[in-house]
Amino acid sequence: MHSTFDFVIVGAGSAGCVLANRLSADGRFSVLLLEAAPQAWRGGNSMHVRNLRCMHDAPQDVLVDAYPEEEFWQDLLKVTGGRTNEALARRVIRDSATCRPWMRRHGVRFQPSLSGALHTARTNAFFMGGGKALVNAYYRSARQLGVQVRYESPVQRIELDDGRFVAAWVGNERIAARSCVLAAGGFESNRDWLRRAWGQNALGEWPADNFLIRGTRFNTGVLLKHLLDDHAADAIGDATQAHMVAIDARAPSYDGGICTRIDCVSLGVVVNREARRFYDEGEDFWPKRYAIWGRLVAQQPGQIGYSIIDAKAVGRFMPPVFDGVQADTLGDLARQLGLDAPTFEATVAAYNAACRPGNFDHTALDDCRTEGLAPAKTHWALPLDTPPYFGYAVRPGITFTYLGLQTDETAAVRFGGQPSPNLFVAGEMMAGNVLGQGYTAGVGMSIGTAFGRIAGTSAAAACGHQHAPQEATDAAA
């Protein structure tokens, strides 16, 4: 079977939907959107998102104060430890300042920062109805614009001619197109690939066996592997780096989403299964540090940790879906969590003794810290001395992986350092160009939205259409 389109988009998450809506805007071209998932699970990881990090030089509707380019860049530089392409990162940052009017035109609605979502009212615009509403809005718009969508249509391979896209294969169907954009996500739901990437630790464990997949089960990386292995596409990123969060250990194996997060880490202590602390819980604001905790827990014995708080923390963070273990004494809490009670009590006693008096303020980098304790807790260090006590078992939860396709400011896939003339990439498949490590809340949506629009413009240009009117509208918005 054979079919031909002007544009084929592989992957129908947020980035793919942005592409589809952009390329179909004037009705001149045929656009096919291929989604691996069934309709009920469409949207990739985008159905689990809740906000977009965006630059703005002055207050805007749901955003307070200002969040200028340089501050956004410094935040990104800090969380990535410098492992980022500055030119591409700044392109994302600048595009984030103009994308919301475009999103609104396609039915996306915004609301102010949620109560309990600390430190994001200035930096992040929240989606009204969450990621599911975002995805549904994009699909409604795509349908109205005449985009063809095929569900349960994973692309296993593509045909190339000297770096030029020719066709994509879905089963036995060959789909030719003048231009193609890849937006098929990472490989986080490919258990075998994760296992190979992470290998064994010093204890003989296979850490990836204990990972939970916070996002979609359909991002298996088949097409990414095909591009890297069979077509020698230029790669970017480390296969062990990912947006990895410490999530409720009771979460499902796949698709737990945002509701599995445990957001009280900075308000207490975190111990491993040996009942010992292993990292500074108060290093920085939670939106800039929540995504390092999955990796930290992955490096602990058994890939499990325990977030511990007392009654003083209740009401200061977004409560998890399921109640934690509760006890009136630390010893009883340890026993319920399966921890050695004397060791746990000694760990908490040492922490309590090291807490220095200060002015507690969870909205600022306060002066409540420990002294003479390793690892230190540098902010929000209050003694755990007010029952009841609460404990939450956490495991590594992967949202998306950072190994992907190297690209440039045109979003072109590159082969041997040369850009393809008609094959482009967007979303998580290229996020490693901006995120070499670490994460900050909402930046994945910034990357997907920005490069969805960039790839759409480049794909149109590859077919001789410059999208000038649309670009002018976006720039003025």
Q: Where would I find each of the regions flagged by the language model?
A:
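Glycine-rich loop(s) and the adjacent beta-strand/alpha-helix scaffold that form part
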Residues: 174-247, 454, 458
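Beta1/beta-strand and adjacent pyrophosphate-binding region of the FAD-binding site
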Residues: 2-15, 32
